[in-house]
Amino acid sequence: MSEPTADAGDNSPSSTDTAPLDRVKAIALLPLRSYLVKFAVALLVILVIIAAGGFWVQADATATLEANTEQQLEQEAVSDATEIGDWLERNEQSVLIASNNPRLGFNTTAADKQAYVTQLVAAELDADRIADVHVADPTVGGASDARIVASTDEDARGTRVSADTHPWVDRTRSIGRDTVVSTNPYRTAGGQRVVSSMSVAADLTHVLVVEYTAGDLSDQFGAGIDGTFTQVVRPTSDATAVLFSDAGTDAVGQPYIPDRSQSEIPALDSATEQGQFTNTPTKDSVLDREYVAAYTTVPGKNWVVVKHAPSESAFALSNQIRTGILGFILVALVGVVLVGGTIGRNTAAAVQSLSAAAAEIEAGNYDVDVASSRRDEIGQLFASIGSMRDALVTQIDEAEAAREQATEAQQDAEAERERAEDARERAEDAKADAEALAAELEAQAERYSDVMAACADGDLTRRMPADDTDNEAMAAIAASFNEMLAQWEHTIIDIQEFADAVATASEEAEVGAADAERASGQVSESVQEIAGAADEQRNMLDTVSGEMTDLSAAIEEVAASADSVAEHSHQTAEIARDGEQTAEDAIERSLTVQEAIDATVQNVEALDDQMAEISEIVDLISDIAEQTNMLALNANIEAARADKSGDGFAVVADEVKDLAEETQESAGDIERRITEVQSQTTATVAEARAAEESMDAGIDAVEEVVDAFTAVSDHADETDTGVQEISDTTDDQAASTEEAVSMTEEVADLSDSTAGEAQSVSAAAEEQAASMSEISDSVESLSGQAEQLKALLSEFEVDADRDVTPTQTD
């Protein structure tokens, strides 16, 4: 195909005719007005928003979960330390109460002390808690020796022990009055692991030592994270020692970290009761993998509870969430890049190629290649521009041929002037047609340029007019370009709908977070149930108080009956003395009434037998009073274990103990008086036997003696009735005491259950509330990012209701 020459004359396009094409070229070369640049910038902004939002969400979620894990490990360490402290405090309270018992007081023998420690262990509700009980005399031997006066260990009774085998010996000389000292854990000769608690006995000379078993204490350590193990360490300035461990007994007694002192292990040196967390414990130097740890001190002891958890287990959930979120971000980024790269890059490349071809045609290079292998609207646009180029070249060639013919006709002979003139006219007509076509093409190109400029500015609703031109090539170009714009507009609408879907999903996530917060209210109901359990515990304590009041009344009845027995016994003694005097007066006058005297002697012997029976009953009362005293001691011990909730019960138990001691003393008085009556009765019998040899007394004196001893018999019957009343009252006392002990056990169990449930529910409610608040914040942030994406897409003006047919114009 030939290229028009520069001297083509008026048939070649003028410089002013190319102005619209120059404008199109200038617009295409402006980066800020380029569709490719805008599309790339929009994709870049979307990528940045998705990446930044995703990274922020995963960082925030990971930090929240890791903080919850750290708090959980700290709370478990504090809970274990509190459990150990409570265990020590219960033991020390029990030892303090037992050491002040009068049976360890002044003027008590070794046998009395031995009987007391035996009964102390027998009365213990949980016998496995106590390994051995000793009463030691620290004043015998050297500073590191002591003599065991009484013990539940038969082999240890009466032996002298040293601190080498019994570590508590070193502490016996430094204990103050009404104080309790506990040792570090150690192993007894029998292999049991124990902790000794000791206090000065009531006689201020001996020391009561109770060895509590501590072997199963480590079994109660909590482990909420897989692979967690707990150790209780005693740090010193020289070295460290593991006192308890739930990771096996091999570590017990060994250094926490070999060749390290307290100051060389910062976590142990700075541990407090509130608990601390560290990601890099010093213990890692001797472990086979990475661990995190929480430290806290045991209240009142120089012991540190160290809870270790494997790092991969402690932060497993946060690592999974981090991986999931990063994977989601990667998929989203790859999807956006693929969509943008596929649609935007190919479309932009085709538009740039088409723009370059149009610029070449504008410059007069009609041989430029405008072919395309695409079969879509872009390919049709290439074909339309190619057809337009071919039509324009054909018209230019025709104009050139007409001009050449006119020139040849002018050079012909004058004879053919008319034909040449006609040819000139035809040439002028052809020129006029060509100029009209050029003007039409210029106007159409200007309109097309305006539409392209608007589209470059983001207005995808504009369309090229295809119906106001008679040129089929220009109409085909407009139709193809309009169809391409319709596809672009549809793509932008799809992206906007995607942004709307993200915003809608964010709102649904906010609703889900609200539902989770309402679920927290159910946790509050669980706390109310715990409060109900506490009320039930209080009601049971009121019942125990009433039962102990009944027990006190029964003891008072025992005392009243004992007074009645004492009064009747006194009257019996007076009557017996009257009978004795009467018998002495009748000795000289009653020789004739020997048979009557024999009958009197038999009555006195019967009275002696009845007095023996009364003595047995009084012994029974003494035994019951002693048992009541031991029950009161046990009640004191249980009240000490119940902490503050058992204060009222302890007061009642003390009153029961005092009444039992008074009853025992009254029974002793009765027994002594009965002994005196029996002695007097024996003397009366002897005197009556002697009276058989000199019965010179008168009949009247003998009758007085019979009457006196008849009165003695009557009073003896009354004494028996009083003793029976004492027996009945004592039975009531025993029943009330048993019921009080049963209720005390139920109250202790309910108290433990209430404390455990309250602690668990409180921790769960706090953690859930914190997590729901943080998740709600993250969802709100994601919703805001979706709104930002919608704002960026709103820069493109589209019509969602438009049909994507290429015939619509704007």
UniProtKB/Swiss-Prot annotation:
* Composition skew (Polar residues), residue ranges: 775-784
HAMP domain: residues covered: 345-397, 439-493
Record's superkingdom? Archaea
Q: Which PROSITE patterns would you find in this protein's record? A: CHEMOTAXIS_TRANSDUC_2, HAMP
Show the Pfam families listed in the entry.
HAMP, MCPsignal
Query: What lineage does UniProt assign to this protein's organism?
Result: Archaea, Methanobacteriati, Methanobacteriota, Stenosarchaea group, Halobacteria
**Extracellular side: which ranges?**
60-323
UniProt similarity note: Belongs to the methyl-accepting chemotaxis (MCP) protein family.
- Renumbered to this chain, the Low complexity biased-composition regions fall at 755-774
State its role: Mediates chemotaxis towards compatible osmolytes. Probably transduces the signal from the substrate-binding protein CosB to the histidine kinase CheA.
Q: Name one GO cellular component term.
A: plasma membrane
Q: Where in the cell is it found?
A: Cell membrane
From the UniProt record, give one GO term of the biological process aspect. Answer: signal transduction
What is the designated name of this protein? Answer: Transducer protein CosT
The Methyl-accepting transducer domain is annotated at 512-748
Q: Which InterPro entries match?
A: HAMP_dom, MCPsignal_dom
Q: Which UniProt keywords apply?
A: Cell membrane, Chemotaxis, Membrane, Methylation, Repeat, Transducer, Transmembrane, Transmembrane helix
